[in-house]
Amino acid sequence: MSRVNFDQLLEAGVHFGHLKRKWNPAMAPYIFMERNGIHIIDLYKTVAKVDEAAEVMKNLAKQGKKVLFVATKKQAKQVVADKAASVGMPYVIERWPGGMLTNFPTIRKAIKKMATIDKMTKDGTFDNLSKREKLQITRQRAKLEKTLGSIVDLTRLPSALFVVDVMKEHIAVREANRLGIPVFGMVDTNSNPNNIDYVIPANDDATKSVEVILGAICEAMNEGLQERKAEKIDAEAAEEAPKRERKAKAAVKKERTKKEDDDALNANVAGKFAKDEE
């Protein structure tokens, strides 16, 4: 069964593309028709592409991989923040930091700087600074939080990127391409799908459109996370089973030995009484 259906996408306005004069010819395979100068996206292809992307994303989540969600446009940023956070994934909704992927060690240093400032606040070091120094550090911390706060748990390069509006986020896409990181993307009729590994043809300008696509993707990822959790519990149970069996055998052996010792003691006492009676 598909994760989204035609009517659901239609209601969310996923089919609305851009003006014909703004189209990218590479999107032709995903365009159904033109109406009043606007390209209409083939929603049956969108359904198929959502299912394909969702399955891959589910497997990534099941394997414990991290997917970085990227959306800095106003209509999408809050939806992406909420959906990504719901499955414990990092996201970028403010300006894309140049070199975020290609210069990842530098980004990690900036994140560690945030942790250092937090530590200063906790251990009292911050209180010993001058008023001016406190103000500078506080502003620096706020700036870092705004751009990097949502990726503090990203300790290594992500296994994939999910991008809303691949044209706007072309720098992120280019960095991922350079490093061979797979890119999932909502691609509108004005964008180039050629550098996107998993194309989801869809209206990337409407909040409802982003909501329905992200909802399906994150639902699949949540399933993957739940399956991973269940497998971990089963593995732990399987590991504990032999231990429990060994404990049970040891308890039986101990009980048997105790019984044998008791029987021997009783026999010894009985023999002594018999000898005394003689």
Swiss-Prot record:
GO biological process entries: translation
Keyword Ribonucleoprotein assigned: yes
Composition skew (Basic and acidic residues), residue ranges: 252-261
GO molecular function: structural constituent of ribosome
GO-annotated cellular components: cytosolic small ribosomal subunit
Region annotation Disordered: where it falls in the sequence: 235-278
Keywords: Ribonucleoprotein, Ribosomal protein
Signal peptide: none
Pfam families hit by this protein: Ribosomal_S2
PROSITE patterns: RIBOSOMAL_S2_1, RIBOSOMAL_S2_2
Similarity comment text for this entry: Belongs to the universal ribosomal protein uS2 family.
Protein name as it appears in the record: Small ribosomal subunit protein uS2
